[in-house]
Amino acid sequence: KAEPDQSYAFLSNISISHKVWILAGVIVPNENNSEAKNLAVLFNPKGKWIGAYQKMYPFTPMGEDQVHTRGKSTKTFHVEGFQLSPILCYDLRFPELFRMNIVQGANLFVVIASWPKVRINHWHTLLQARAIENQAYVIGLNRTGKDPNHNYSGSSRIIDPTGKTVMEMKGKEEVASTKLDRNLVDEWRDKFPVLKDIRE
């Protein structure tokens, strides 16, 4: 297992080499105890560390809550005109987390996951639901391959603020790119102002 500094240096070098933003999921030791932290870490195209989000909902059915320290706050980062909020795997099942980010101005969610094939229909449905109810872009990034317990079928995708799937990937490792229309978020929120009815 790589030490945090090694993982961060690796990700920083990728962002510099390809001149891209990098948002990646990593597991790192917790400085205060024997547990670990599940993080989404963000680097800009110059390789600079921008920040990290710590998973707020460890996956209790598999005992993550016994070995991973629970995050205490949401995070939103300004990236290329968007307010990006990272989400980690099981977090996707908790709509209140998304709403907390919406209150902070989020309009783009990136969900990094190890979502097994046996529940892939949940993955599809929840990604679309989070996009629709928050009138935001949702990018779902899921692993492929297998481990001793599960097969993983990928199915990474991008859902726009209206709930339309604008990009879908299959069950193998792939790299793809597309453009997101920042104006679509504002246009749809103005046309159908659901978020104005959120109650405190």
Predicted regions and their residues:
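Active-site catalytic loop in hydrolytic enzyme cores
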Residues: 9, 13, 31-104, 117-125, ...
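Generic structural signal for secondary-structure transition and capping sites
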Residues: 19-20, 58, 136, 193, ...
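Short beta-strand-to-turn element immediately C-terminal to the catalytic PLP-Schiff-base lysine
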Residues: 42-44, 159-160, 178-180
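Short, basic/aromatic-enriched C-terminal tail that caps enzymatic domains
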Residues: 177-200
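CN hydrolase (nitrilase-like) catalytic-core segments centered on the catalytic cysteine
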Residues: 2-24, 93-176
